[in-house]
A protein has these predicted regions:
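Alpha-helical support elements that line or immediately flank enzyme active sites
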Residues: 24, 28-31, 64-78, 133, ...
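Short, hydrophobic/amphipathic alpha-helical packing segments
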Residues: 22, 26, 164-169
């Protein structure tokens, strides 16, 4: 495999190597995200310390989302269920966060979360990475994606709809009307990509979705 990787870097086609990596990615998710357990965190389930990097928590600024991007599209619907169960535990504390920090309806989360329902920003003044009010709506897109692939109406009725609706309420209330009559999101930022601004692409994209 090392030789094949070396040749691949030189531009030699190797479709089997690509398939091997594809299946390896599926294996990692299968091994670290099974129904009835916690979802895959920053390191999946693989680290050799009592306290792993970044406290082995759940980073909602793209990390946990990236873990699950291939789940439904690679026919691993059941691997998404631990993530959805985890998101459900964030809703009630996330409602308090939405009201206390932003004065909105609905629920949201922030950059970091854990199994104890942590949804507020971290104790840091570095808002370029710590400020992420669209973490909740971004997580909610995974709930919709699960329904979009499975078309499980019972799931949508009993689990998905209320969670997504509450998240959409937060996103709607987060918008403010400008003097020209258009709506924008402010303050907003793209996680770990620059300062606080008005109407960043990331925030508007999540709200539209």
């Amino acid at each position: 495999t090392a030789k094949r990787l070396q040749n691949y870097r030189k531009g030699q086609p190797d479709f089997y190597l690509e398939e091997l990596y594809y299946q390896f990615g599926r294996y990692l998710l299968i091994a670290s995200s099974r129904p009835g357990n916690m979802p895959a965190n920053l390191q999946g389930i693989w680290h050799n310390n009592v306290d792993g990097p970044w406290r082995v928590d759940y980073h909602n600024n793209i990390n946990i989302q990236m873990n699950y991007w291939p789940a439904c599209s690679t026919n691993l619907y059941e691997c998404t269920l631990p993530l959805i169960d985890f998101i459900r535990t964030l809703v009630k504390p996330g409602q308090k966060t939405a009201q206390a920090y932003f004065g909105t309806r609905g629920w949201t989360a922030s950059i970091s979360a854990n199994i104890f329902g942590f949804t507020t920003p971290l104790e840091s003044e570095e808002m370029a990475w710590n400020f992420n009010p669209m973490a909740g709506p971004w997580l909610a897109t995974h709930v919709w994606e699960y329904y979009d692939y499975t078309r499980d109406k019972k799931f949508l009725k009993e689990t998905g709809y209320d969670l997504i609706k509450s998240s959409a309420q937060f996103a709607t209330d987060f918008l403010w009307r400008k003097p020209d009559g258009t709506y924008t999101a402010a303050p907003s930022t793209s996680p770990e990509h620059g300062p606080i601004d008005e109407g960043t692409t990331f925030v508007h994209a999540v709200i539209r979705e």
